[in-house]
Structures are given as structure tokens and as C-alpha cells.
């Protein structure tokens, strides 16, 4: 049975979709863009955008009663793969700071993302 997850600690969906769905042991998190929940603003640089996206994913993970260690897959969409070294730096620090191993990951360059952001990530978690 699907259980919809919504939290005020992550941006509201900008379209007709849920922040996340829990189904038995799986948690599927919709693509998150770097909207700061408190201010509603989107920073300009890729490092801040990456950090906010990961922070938003963490908020959904916590609201779902999962942990960062439960994340098994992340898909990164970016408008500029030449900035992957910056994304990787923030990404690596996030998982180390949360005492987690690195989940599997794919990185895909796209022409454009919603609200003209530079990065979006979706995630999947599994918990026994």
C-alpha cells in the first residue's frame, strides 16, 4: 500500500506529485530542487543549490522515519556537468557528515530544469 509523505520542512511540490511515497520497505522521493524552505528563495551558485537539495531530501527522509544511511540510490540532474567537481564536493561532505556510505548514483546533464535551477535530485531509500 502506498503512503504519501509530505513535510513542511521541504518545498511543496510545484506540480501534481507527492514529495515522496512509502511502499512497504521502500521510500521514493520525487525530484527536489533548491528552494530554501524558510525564505522560498533559490540561491544562484551550484554549491549552495546542491546543499539545499540535499537538505530538502534529508527533511523528507526524516519525516518518513528513515535515515540518510537508508538511501540506496540518488539521481542527479544538472544543467552543467562541467560543475560536477563542485557537486561532488558538497555531496561527499553531506554523506560523510551524516555518517553514511555513498549510495549508488547517476548524473545526467539536462538542457533545463524547473525554475531555471542548476540541479535537481531524486532519491530512493530502503529500510528493513
Curated annotation (Swiss-Prot):
Q: CDD domains this protein is in? A: YjgF_YER057c_UK114_family
Segment forming the signal sequence: none
GO CC term, one of those recorded? cytosol
What molecular functions are annotated in GO for this chain?
Answer: deaminase activity
**Domain of life of the source:** Bacteria
State the family named in the UniProt similarity comment for this chain.
Belongs to the RutC family.
- Give the protein's recorded name: RutC family protein BUsg_359
Q: What is the lineage of its organism?
A: Bacteria, Pseudomonadati, Pseudomonadota, Gammaproteobacteria, Enterobacterales
